[in-house]
Amino acid sequence: MLDKLAFLEEKYEDLSEKISEPEIINDQPQWKKLVKEHSDLEEIVMKYREYKKTEQGLNDAKEILRDKTADEEFREMAKMEIAELEEKIEVLEGELKILLLPKDPNDDKDVIVEIRAGAGGDEAGLFAADLFRMYTRYAENVGWKVEMMSANDTGIGGYKEVIFMIKGHGAYSRLKYESGVHRVQRIPSTESGGRIHTSTITVAVLPEADDVDFELDMNDIRVDVFRSSGNGGQSVNTTDSAVRVTHIPTGTVVSCQDEKSQLKNKEKALKILRARLLDVLIQEQQAEIAQDRKSQVGTGDRSERIRTYNFPQGRITDHRINVTLYRLDSFLNGDIQEMIDALITTDQAEKLKEVNS
C-alpha cells in the first residue's frame, strides 16, 4: 500500500509542475485534463502526507522512550503520545485503504433523476411528488442546482412521472444509491376508515452522459413533433413545440413538452435519452459484477424494494443496510445525508472486504 501511495504522491508533484507550464496552459483541453487528474489525487496525497507526519511523530516519541537519560515525566508524556499516535495511524490506514479503492468513473457527474408512480393510484402519485420535493430540498441544502426536465402530473398535486436534473460536483456519488423501489405506508386523507394504504414508486438515478461517454448517432434517432397539452387535453400552446425522440435500435422513447421552444424540448429529450442509453451499459456491467458480489448496496437493481416510509410510525427503513430512522418529517424535507453516509460506508466496507479476501 505504501509503495502505491508514494507513487501517487510523486505523480501528484509531477502534475503540480506540469499544470504551471506555459505550453500546457496554452493547450486548454490538455491543461483541463491534467488539472482534473491533479484534483482527483489531492485528497489521497494530503491524507498520505498526514500519515507520514504522524508516523514521524510516533518514531520521535519512541526515540524519547528509548532514551534512558530522559526525564521520567518526559518519558510518561512520550508513552501517552505513542498510544494516541498509534490509534491515529490505524484510523489513517483505514481511510487510505478506502481512498485507494477503484473509483466509479461516473461519481463526479451531474445526474438525471426519474421518479415514476407505481402501485397505489393517486397515493403513489402524491408520494412521487413528496420524493421530488425531498431530493430538491436536499440538493438546495448542499448547494446543487435543480432543473426540471419533464413532468406528467396527476392534476391533484402528484406526478405520474417526473424527470429532473441535479447539477453539482459528486451528485452521482451521493445519489446513485437512491435507485430502486420506494414504498410508502400511510392513511390517505380521503380514507374515512383510517386504513393504511401501501403504495410504491420507482426512482432511477442516471449519470449525465456526454459525447465522450456515449456517442449518439443521429441516424439512429427519429424525431417527432406534436402539440403539447395540459390536463384534460387542453391546449397549452398553438405550436408544435412538444418533441418525441425515438432511439430506433433499442426502441427507447423520450418525450418532452415542458418548454415553449421546440429546440429546448429536443435538447432535453436527447439529454435524457443519452443518459438512459448509458445507464443500460452501466446496468449490464453491474449485473456482471453482482454475480461475483454479495453486495446489497451497490447493485442498483431497479426492481429491488430498497426503502419503506411508514407515516403512522414516523420511520424510514432502508432494507439493504437494515437502518431505521425515526424522523420521517425532516427526512422528507431533505435531511437525508445520514442515510446516504450509511449507504456509502456500507458499500465501501463491502468493497474493502472483497479486496482483502
Curated annotation (Swiss-Prot):
The keyword Transcription does not apply. The keyword Transferase does not apply. Methylated by PrmC. Methylation increases the termination efficiency of RF1. InterPro entries: PCRF, Pep_chain_release_fac_I, Pep_chain_release_fac_I_sf, Prokaryotic/Mito_RF, RF-1. The modification N5-methylglutamine is found at Q234. Keywords: Cytoplasm, Methylation, Protein biosynthesis. It is found in: Cytoplasm. Transmembrane segments: none annotated. GO terms for cellular component: cytoplasm. One of its GO terms (molecular function) is translation release factor activity, codon specific. Signal peptide: none annotated. It holds the Pfam family RF-1. Belongs to the prokaryotic/mitochondrial release factor family. Peptide chain release factor 1 directs the termination of translation in response to the peptide chain termination codons UAG and UAA. This is Peptide chain release factor 1. The gene is prfA.
